[in-house]
Amino acid sequence: MSATTAHAPGDGPLCLVTGATGYIGGRLVPELLAAGYRVRCMARSPGRLHDHPWIGQVEVAHADVTDAAAVRRGIEGVEVAYYLIHALGTGEDFAAIDRRAASVFAAAAKDAGVRRIVYLGGLGPAGDGRLSEHLRSRGEVGEILLASGVPAAVLRAAVVIGSGSASFEMMRYLSERLPVMIAPRWVRTRIQPIAVRDALRYLTGCAALPRDVNRTFDIGGPEVLTYEEMMHRYAAVAGLPRRVVIPVPVLTPGLSSLWVGLVTPVPGPLARPLVESLRHEVVCHEHDIARYVPDPPEGLIGFDEAIRLALKRIRNADFATRWSSVSAPREPSDPLPTDPDWAGGSLHTDVRESEVAASPETLWRVIEGIGGEHGWYSWPLAWAVRGRLDRLVGGVGLRRGRRDPYRLRVGDSLDFWRVEELLPGTLLRLRAEMRLPGRAWLELSVEERQGRTWYRQRALFHPRGLLGQLYWWAVRPFHGIVFGGMQRNVRRAAERAAAPGRP
């Protein structure tokens, strides 16, 4: 029996999404809206929701899930309640907090007459008394919700593949930063990962489950892989050389989490329980969910395609775009503005700005005239040497110049840059076409604040593998000379052009 139900926009049952500022919650909301459901988001910090493109289409309830009175107010009138909260990474006794929060939520849902609870937990071996505290806590929360008296669907997933997922980000950083890795035995553990868009499709479909369904469902993608195989496959899709992984038996979960903390930016309190859980085989034992939420005709998304989707924004150079265009629809595998700073892959930046004693129009003329015969307003020798080195390794070098000495358009070559985005009078974004172990952009912009003109300059670099990381840190000491000099000289050029007596 299929649980898929279509509703007219905004005409469906009211769904409550807890954890809407989290990884899954923030991506589930637009899926529910697209399916015609009305949505209320419950958040401890509602201000963190404001950058989402869907904020104007939802209700917002301010509540801490351990506050019974606030939860009762937030859940009133709700038909389907999504419980997407866990205390992992708080550094406290997260299992006790999870039990208390789930009990409060379950009682409030029953008192409010909620028709369905949907929870996303962790996949683990059944009946294993040696479960990690993380997986054991997820299981306890599921049991509390199943015993609530409200029909519950407890979905159990292993690693969710998508930009922003903590498990995926840990694998991404390990794969990108370590060409050779001495690894613990858990790299040989079997895992059944699932693409985030497939997980969201199951979660959305559970809103229409029959009332008599009160059970767990294992959800996973079409492949079972070891962690080592996942790292090798990630490297292949990302265009990295094959990784060398040497398993050793001596690294305990505690030591492994310390090592992960050194290599990746994933916080230690979050990395440790994730690492501890990797010693367990996490493979689906059934696929009963397909009886209610059928698999798509083309099948579930495979691991390689899930990685490609997660890396799509990087490949399309969308790293440089800002969150000012949050109204644009985004894919579930894309990063979101509420994702942690460490999510989405490495992005190094050099940001400088200064007030300019000139009109915005005068400053823009200087910016649009940069490069070619006008130069780069910075240490000329450094640019010349970088251009010569680029030519020596088969790059384009500095000799391309520019099409027009004063005007630019999107697609123009500009020495070893390409004009990627141009908003006349406001923004010039250049993408580097020099040979680099990564991708680089240079963004020059004009801002007017309270009648004053400001120049903002931002250099961005997305490293490719360990060599890319080493390259950034090797050239970083020179940024003060190159980019600092550019910022000062662009400002001075605009102020000279604005001086009295200049044409």
Give short role names for the model-derived ranges.
Residues A3-P9, G205-P273, E281-R352:
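Mid/C-terminal beta-alpha module of Rossmann-like enzyme folds, strongest
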Residues A8-Y37:
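N-terminal Rossmann NAD(P)H-binding glycine-rich loop of SDR-like oxidoreductase domains
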Residues T18, M42, L84, I117-L123, ...:
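SDR active-site strand-loop-helix element
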Residues Y37-R44:
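Conserved glycine-rich Rossmann-like NAD(P)H-binding loop of the short-chain dehydrogenase/reductase
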Residues L347-H348, E355-W364, E368-P437, E448-Q450, ...:
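Glycine-rich portal/gate segments that line the openings of hydrophobic small-molecule binding cavities
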Residues A432-G480, V490:
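Beta-strand/loop substructures that line and gate deep hydrophobic ligand-binding cavities in soluble
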